[in-house]
UniProtKB/Swiss-Prot annotation:
Pfam families hit by this protein: AAA_2, ClpB_D2-small, zf-C4_ClpX
HAMAP family: ClpX (MF_00175)
GO biological process terms, semicolon-separated: cell division; proteolysis involved in protein catabolic process
Record organism: Methylococcus capsulatus (strain ATCC 33009 / NCIMB 11132 / Bath)
Protein name per its UniProtKB record: ATP-dependent Clp protease ATP-binding subunit ClpX 2
Length: 428
């Protein structure tokens, strides 16, 4: 049986909706299926039911959103110190995703519109900026990507276009646009795109101020056109439309020299009897000075005012001291010492790194000014020869590392177990 364009079958019989029973004259459209018909009103009703269920599931999902204290607790497991930064991040991320859930469940026109709060992380190299962003994304189970600001240029110049950032986050979630629109983007080395001078340049600054201008709309929220599956742009192809309004952008940078700008501002006083006289003897460390950063300092450093305005949440990280670096070596879930012990266990060998060795590793990293990032390099260099020999020797049961080994004054102490050699010979 076939239906003509007026809703009657080929025999001229009047047709009815199989669900609500309305005739073809009572509805706008009647859709035919195998021996059944459905009207446009029933289709719309089904859509409403599904939409309500999706909103309900979104609201129940909001209950699963970890609270700020829970977020900080997870950050504590991976990041040592930086208490203030972790609190700021926990609240900012919680509010961001709470805003997203509110958009999904409430669509009233007269409701208060919640603005997006992107984050700026300021801290020395190896202080934990990238690790904080990675841990947040893993906790929230959202797509996460890292972009290097130093490779970005204005559109039309050699280098990466800012829209490549959206390309990267799409790749992380197999080009699922809806999922990508709720992700986190960490832009590293953001201080490297600062304007080269305080005054706007006459010549074009394609990797500095030009990139800041290009990032403005992307960070605030725009619909970016991205080629599907990472292809090149050409006029005949269809683009994926990605709305960046709900993507959380976290920008991080060391901002070397920013502390001098902050100190010069804080040392300035008034004139006359009402002047606020301030001492020039500022014994605070870099981290303590950076904690006093204000928007005008960032603008003097070289960020344009519009860009600073798009990053309302600012968290500063402290420089890691020896005690913090020792804790980083041993305490986090994925601590380096735990990782190397596990590698040695897989060779049926115990690794002991003594306390004086941990202190020596921390001091070396501080001398190199690489922060926590340099700890792995030092350990890898120290244990390289041992890890080279270990798989070929079945007698080594324990390796001991002390301060002299770290300083290059002696080799790691290897303890041999002759019973292991006998067991190996018996097995042969």
């Amino acid at each position: 049986m076939s239906e003509d364009k007026h809703g009657k079958d080929s025999g001229g019989k009047l047709l009815y909706c199989s669900f609500c029973g309305k005739s073809q004259h009572e509805v706008r459209k009647l859709i035919a299926g195998p021996a059944v018909f459905v009207c446009d009103e029933c289709v719309e009703l089904c859509n409403d039911i599904i939409r309500e269920e999706l909103q309900e599931s979104a609201s129940t999902g909001a209950d699963k959103l970890p609270k700020p204290k829970e977020i900080k607790k997870v950050l504590d497991e991976y990041v040592i110190g930086q208490e203030k930064a972790k609190r700021i991040l926990s609240v900012a991320v919680y509010n961001h995703y709470k805003r997203l859930r509110a958009q999904q469940t409430h669509s009233k026109k007269n409701e208060v519109e919640l603005a997006k709060s992107n984050i700026l992380l300021i801290g020395p190299t190896g202080s934990g900026k990238t690790l904080l962003a990675e841990t947040l994304a893993r906790l929230l189970d959202v797509p996460f990507t890292i972009a290097d600001a130093t490779t970005l240029t204005e559109a039309g110049y050699v280098g990466e276009d800012v829209e490549n950032i959206i390309q990267k986050i799409l790749q992380k979630c197999d080009y699922d646009v809806e999922k990508a629109e709720q992700g986190i983007v960490y832009i590293d080395e953001i201080d490297k795109i600062s304007r080269k001078a305080d005054n706007p340049s006459i010549t074009r600054d394609v990797s500095g101020e030009g990139v800041q201008q290009a990032l403005l709309k992307l960070i605030e929220g725009t619909v970016a056109s991205v080629p599907p599956q990472g292809g090149r742009k050409h006029p005949q192809q269809e683009f994926l439309q990605v709305n960046t309004a709900n993507i959380l952008f976290i920008c991080g940078g060391a901002f070397a020299g920013l502390e001098k700008i902050i100190r010069s501002r804080s040392e300035q006083g008034g004139i006359g009897f009402a002047a606020d006289v301030k001492s020039k003897d500022d014994s605070r460390n870099v981290g303590e000075v950076l904690a006093d950063v204000e928007a005008e300092d960032l603008i003097r450093y070289g960020l344009i005012p519009e860009f600073v305005g798009r990053l309302p949440v600012v968290a500063t990280l402290e420089e890691l001291d020896e005690a913090a670096l020792v804790r980083i070596l041993t305490e986090p879930k994925n601590a380096l010492v735990k990782q190397y012990r596990r590698l040695f266990e897989m060779e049926s060998c115990e690794l002991e790194i003594r306390d004086d060795a941990l202190g020596a590793i921390a001091r070396k990293a501080m001398a190199r000014k690489t922060g926590a990032r340099g700890l792995r390099t030092i350990l890898e260099h120290t244990l390289l020869d041992t890890m080279y020999e270990l798989p070929s020797s079945e007698r080594i049961s324990k390796v001991v590392v002390d301060e002299k080994v770290i300083n290059g004054e002696s080799e790691p102490l290897m303890i041999y177990d002759n019973s292991l050699e006998k067991q190996a010979a018996a097995a042969d």
